Regions:
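A structural signal for multi-pass alpha-helical bundles of membrane permease subunits
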Residues: 2-289
Length: 289
């Protein structure tokens, strides 16, 4: 009876998991082995691994993967460093206006990604935006929407959006440290840097692993920012395959290739899960040292 009672509490979340995650995943998996175009699945034919073979020879797909990989390697460390620095500053108790600082730092995360991207897109404008005013005042020719710096500009938007979110995770982790450790360190004559190095940073290892995994998943799912900026950048700087998610979206809804888009989504899910698993294993090894 106790097991049955426990199962009843798990039932709602299991139903949500099956309906929202498991069924769509299995449906996409089935689509990826057919020639389904998005109209009538009854007419779809089984094609085996043809979609996956095509995908592994698709230069546009690998170009998109390489772009988000570069984005992840550069943007995630910068964002998490800023988040950790802000959390340490808040936890130091030496920062005036702590509540205001915490709320204002988290506020960008509460702004919808579409709105954030539009705001930054207008500021990036070389003619009428903030960058345009800067160019007019200093006589420069800075263009934040040019193809050479576009990925960095998108990274700046994402960093602005999610630094506060990660900061709260770090700050929550620091808040669990007993004050007795700080008192003992002060009695021993430890400096502020020694306290950070020996007490605070080790405490951040667990939360760092979580934020890294979430950030990697978010980076590989990059869609909103480049999609919104697509109509704001000159020329064809943001292509339909700029990121894997944009490529899958355009294949499915514009190209009537739901089967190929499903195969792409499955491969990206496997890649993302593999990277997240490796990060988690490394984190567990570090915590066991």
């Amino acid at each position: 009876m106790e097991n049955f009672a426990s199962a009843r509490f798990l039932l709602p979340i299991m139903v949500v998991f099956i309906v929202v995650i498991l069924i769509p995943f299995l449906q996409s998996l089935v689509f990826s082995f057919t020639d389904y175009s998005g109209y009538n699945f009854a007419d779809a034919k089984f094609v085996g691994f043809a979609n996956y073979i095509r995908l592994f020879h698709d230069q546009q797909f690998w170009s998109a993967v390489g772009r988000v990989a570069l984005f992840t390697v550069v943007q995630v460390p910068i964002m998490l460093f800023l988040a950790a620095a802000m959390a340490l500053a808040l936890d130091s108790m030496k920062l005036h206006g702590t509540k205001f600082f915490r709320i204002s730092t988290f506020l960008p995360y509460a702004v919808p990604a579409v709105v954030s991207t539009l705001i930054w897109g207008f500021m990036y404008g070389a003619k009428y935006g903030l960058v345009g005013s800067f160019n007019g005042f200093f006589g420069t020719h800075l263009d934040m929407l040019s193809p050479s710096v576009l990925l960095a500009s998108i990274g700046n938007i994402v960093t602005w959006e999610f630094t506060g979110y990660n900061m709260l995770i770090f700050y929550s982790s620091l808040s669990t440290i007993p004050h007795s450790l700080y008192e003992a360190a002060s009695i021993d004559g430890a400096s502020e840097w020694q306290i950070i190095k020996s007490i605070k940073l080790p405490e951040l290892k667990g939360s760092l692993a979580i934020t890294v995994i979430f950030s990697i998943i978010g980076s590989f799912q990059l869609f909103n920012e480049p999609s919104i900026l697509q109509n704001m950048v000159p020329g064809n700087a943001i292509t339909t395959y700029y990121t894997p998610n944009m490529y899958a979206y355009n294949l499915s809804f514009s190209g009537n290739q739901s089967n190929y888009a499903a195969a792409l989504a499955i491969v990206m899910a496997v890649i993302t899960m593999a990277i997240a698993y490796i990060v988690q294993l490394n984190s567990l090894k570090e915590q066991m040292k």
